[in-house]
Amino acid sequence: MSTRFQEHYQSKVVADLIAKFGYKSVMEVPRITKVTLNMGLGDAVNDKKIIENAVGDLTKVAGQKPVVTKAKKAIAGFKIRQGYPIGAMVTLRSSRMYEFLDRFVTVALPRVRDFRGISGKAFDGRGNYNIGVKEQIIFPEIEYDKIDALRGLNISITTTAKTDEEAKALLAAFKFPFRN
């Protein structure tokens, strides 16, 4: 089952990127390999319900159960012991990834307060893009009445692009609303 974004990539994006960058093979064209959603929950040390609620929110947003991340080492200043649950993350690939990106670009991003576009400078130098979301309520799957606290999450989009310019062209072809 291919999604709307997958069909858009195969029918339009590949041809556009070959024309723009002059790739010799279709396999050279950059593609999105995975999307990772990460929610850091430092305040979960005192309350275990926070982790459960965050896992529930991420499950609704991603459509897949996240893994609870645990502290690698103890940090006395933050009252964290090794092995304490301090976050949740989920990695999306193939059709779930494209479905999430479709919902993120078309539904969630326009719901951000005072939204003027996403930064074009958040690339890491190797063609990957990171975006932070301050509130999980921008996603339509999250019901405002049922959340206990506003939590942000980090979205990492990993691509096969060699440069930031190629990655930006790829994401722009997927209608990512860049500011500049």
Curated annotation (Swiss-Prot):
Subunit: Part of the 50S ribosomal subunit; part of the 5S rRNA/L5/L18/L25 subcomplex. Contacts the 5S rRNA and the P site tRNA. Forms a bridge to the 30S subunit in the 70S ribosome.
Gene this chain is encoded by: rplE
Protein name: Large ribosomal subunit protein uL5
GO MF entry, a single one: structural constituent of ribosome
General function of this protein: This is one of the proteins that bind and probably mediate the attachment of the 5S RNA into the large ribosomal subunit, where it forms part of the central protuberance. In the 70S ribosome it contacts protein S13 of the 30S subunit (bridge B1b), connecting the 2 subunits; this bridge is implicated in subunit movement. Contacts the P site tRNA; the 5S rRNA and some of its associated proteins might help stabilize positioning of ribosome-bound tRNAs.
Gene Ontology cellular-component terms listed: ribonucleoprotein complex; ribosome
Pfam families per record: Ribosomal_L5, Ribosomal_L5_C
InterPro entries: Ribosomal_uL5, Ribosomal_uL5_bac-type, Ribosomal_uL5_C, Ribosomal_uL5_CS, Ribosomal_uL5_dom_sf, Ribosomal_uL5_N
The species this protein was found in: Polynucleobacter necessarius subsp. necessarius (strain STIR1)
SUPFAM superfamilies registered for this protein in UniProt: RL5-like (SSF55282)
Keyword Signal: no
